[in-house]
Amino acid sequence: MAAEFIKSCCRGCLYGETEKQKFSVDRDFKASASSSQNTIGIPPLTSVLVKPQVGCNEDYLLSKLPCDGKEVQFVVPRFKLSYIQPRTQGIPSHLDELEGSARASFGDQKTELCSSFYHGPSYDVYNPCYMYQHFSPDLSRRFLPHCETKQLYGSVCDLRTSKLPGSSGLSKSMLDLTTSSQRFIQRHDSFSSVPSSSSSRKNSQGSNRSLDTITLSGDERDLGRLNVKLFYNSSAEQIWITVLQCRDISWPSSYGDTPTISIKGILTLSKPVHFKSSAKEGSNAIEFMETFVFAIKLQNLQAVRLAFKIQTQTPKKKTIGECSLSLRTLSTQEMEYSLEIIAPSKISVCQAELELGTCFQAVNSRIQLQILEAQYLPSSSTPLTLSFFVKVGMFSSGELIYKKKTRLLKASSGRVKWGETMIFPLIQTEKEIVFLIKLYSRSSVRRKHFVGQLWISEDSNNIEAVNQWKETITNPEKVVIKWHKLNPS
């Protein structure tokens, strides 16, 4: 019915305009003929001025008709509701442009599509920047329902996202940075890998096992602590190393109840200095109380590390644990350290350290990360020197937001100085901010080798990283610089 009505209206308008035009032409011709007796040099009819017609005339429409006289099918197009999402949501100026009815119909249609199309983590079907990704059932269980689908923020529009009315920018951003939760502490093998939850993992058969039910291996058990005391005598240029005691040490059950245990120390100079304590009978708290003195200049000591190896002498000589500390803070003031003993590594242990600077710029809503220097870097097995670079990834709620890297520089005497500054913008929706910093080496054959990594967050397993993050967040605009030992995994 609607199609026939519109068709008849179009025909009526077309033929009405044609008859009107013919009548006006006849009237002009009769008037000119009656006045031809008194007028000389009447111009032809074709030269009479006619008001230009707006739109299409009859001849144009008739020329488009088929030559065989077939009837042209007139089809009424189906109209659908459409809506173009503004670039910035939540601004009243954009919302006022929509009428109430259109806004209501859009909201109803959006709710219907969201509820019928996908029953998982919420996302915006009208967001033109959204890219659909398939989530396996296991991954959908790992992420909480309130996690929103995020994108890699790189455009100017994203970086200048406006705040909602009535929100306090500084207090809100500081709250997001400081209130991180344990449920999003995850491990990433690389920037492109899928994060694995710390609460459960899948074995090779695909079954989930809680960490509480997994038996810890020898590399994961707490192997005790070694207490030492350091002092530097500036007048005699001597370092005094006192091995105090070893507590809560564990050893293989095949070694019996009371094996004899000794401590071996190494000053990692260009020509290493070794020393060894006397053997003591194994117990829960082994008292050594032995002091070792070496005449070495302070500036040489502050560039090396002091490593310890815990060894059994009877019934079998074997290294059951090791630990180390940096002598950078060595001074004339006597300091006592409690070192955590870890399982001995079958490969060379990563001793690399990285100097980082952080600054929370609350006014500009961004975090400034400085990659300053690295030391104790591994040496090459070939005469050619290695080159090093650092990769930095910023995660929010377990998802990668930004990734950057430094330039490639050659090492000199086991040290590299970058002095580079990276800027990471923040927005209101980003929570549980975590930085993953990885150090890589590159050989002459362009092969990349992983050296070590460091997590900087409130829940990092590195105490220095936790302290630096807390000091950065609680003191905006202050640059906090600290050295960190990299973890090999």
Swiss-Prot record:
SUPFAM superfamilies per record: C2 domain (Calcium/lipid-binding domain, CaLB) (SSF49562)
Residues found modified as Phosphoserine: 82, 155, 167, 173, 210, 217
Main localisation: nucleus
Xref: Pfam families: C2
UniProt region (Disordered), positions on chain: 189-214
SMART domains in the cross-refs: C2
Protein name per UniProt: Tandem C2 domains nuclear protein
